[in-house]
């Protein structure tokens, strides 16, 4: 893969007093770019994002990608009016803070149930995207809608929505593990999304459960995926996203994506 590879670290499991030392360790593996974690957004302390940015700078790291706040009350398909307003407000504040970090993509979950139909959520998705895109544009960050646990039909319609919206600050995040276990497979799902993929979440599984394994611990054809990634017209970078984010896992990703 010719584009930059960004490494995911599960920062929410790391004590505050260990964050900087872990950043230094990760940098010693050859990592230069890390995924900015949503746990760094604290509603009672907005300055914490700046603190983390300073840690990264001191460790010789940068962050070009961020996973949006996610889960109940944070996802795109939030139907309660007050909850939706609060959700949009949080994302806007986080995006404003991320502009100081240098983040370029912000991956956003739909939050739809697996069997949900696009027609039932389309208006809410559009409403949320409409609300966030001006903030994304102001901060030069692309909003990337992710294929999560939804059906292949919904992913096709979401992809058509993004294509029809045709906005430079709206794209898609292709999650290879989700494609492998929830949709029609990696190649097939990537082809559906290909024209507007701006970032990727890469991890492995055997096609039956969303394990978030490093390469080699599943049935993903990494050689094929590596080739496919270089054909994506809007791809800015790709992100590792395995639960095992240690040094061996990092080097496994580098090996299969020819980053060594």
Could you describe each region identified by the protein language model?
Residues 72-79, 112-119, 181-182, 207-213:
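A short acidic, helix-capping loop that chelates divalent metal ions and anchors anionic groups
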């Amino acid at each position: 893969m010719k584009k930059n590879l960004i490494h995911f670290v599960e920062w929410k499991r790391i004590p505050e007093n260990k964050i900087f030392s872990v950043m230094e360790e990760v940098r010693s593996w050859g990592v230069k770019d890390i995924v900015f974690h949503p746990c760094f957004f604290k509603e009672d302390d907005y300055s914490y994002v700046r603190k983390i940015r300073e840690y990264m700078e001191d460790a010789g790291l940068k962050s070009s990608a961020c996973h949006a706040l996610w889960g109940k009350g944070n996802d795109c398909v939030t139907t309660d009016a007050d909850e939706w307003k609060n959700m949009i407000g949080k994302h806007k504040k986080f995006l404003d803070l991320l502009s100081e970090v240098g983040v370029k993509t912000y991956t956003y979950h739909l939050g739809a149930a697996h069997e949900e139909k696009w027609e039932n959520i389309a208006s809410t998705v559009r409403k949320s995207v409409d609300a966030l895109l001006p903030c994304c544009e102001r901060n030069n960050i692309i909003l990337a809608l992710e294929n999560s646990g939804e059906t292949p039909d919904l992913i096709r319609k979401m992809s058509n929505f993004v294509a029809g919206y045709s906005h430079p600050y709206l794209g898609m995040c292709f999650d290879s593990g989700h494609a492998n276990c929830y949709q029609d497979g990696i190649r097939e799902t990537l082809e559906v999304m290909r024209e507007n993929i701006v970032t990727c979440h890469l991890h492995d599984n055997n096609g039956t459960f969303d394990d978030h394994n490093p390469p080699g611990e599943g049935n993903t054809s990494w050689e094929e995926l590596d080739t496919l990634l270089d054909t994506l017209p809007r791809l800015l970078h790709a992100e590792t996203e395995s639960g095992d984010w240690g040094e061996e896992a990092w080097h496994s990703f580098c090996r299969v994506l020819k980053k060594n």
